[in-house]
């Protein structure tokens, strides 16, 4: 169940793919993404696998919800175009779904929700995902950002540990 392929211990690719196949879990994710889109909340989604990202994107598209999907095996042109559409909110695109692409080196000041659908045992990876939305005003981000985490993560990390890195930016204690 645990792999060390990324330089840190985390769930194996096979485990993440299995989690991504949960029909009930995906329906709950879809329901919440639809609500966020209806409220015009720019949202970054961290999927469990490439296939999971593609399934979520396809399901949203089928119901008429604009979104973009990015993953490592896409051409850089396709990836850059998808990111541009999200950043510019082109065609009212409020949702960007990704798998292992936008955890570092991606900045979009319009993100108002970070939606983590992939469990992780790595506090580093978890912090990187949170960091896409929790930049705070001093770092060019928003004052508020909604975090939606599928129950898999915060059972591993207590809340103080998960959020302590960002207290300096948000003025928290």
Q: What spans do the regions from the language model cover?
A:
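A conserved SF2-helicase RecA2
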Residues: 1, 127, 135-173
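A short beta-strand element within the Helicase C-terminal
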Residues: 94-120, 125-132, 144-150
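Conserved interdomain linker/interface between the two RecA-like ATPase lobes of SF2 helicase motors
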Residues: 1-47
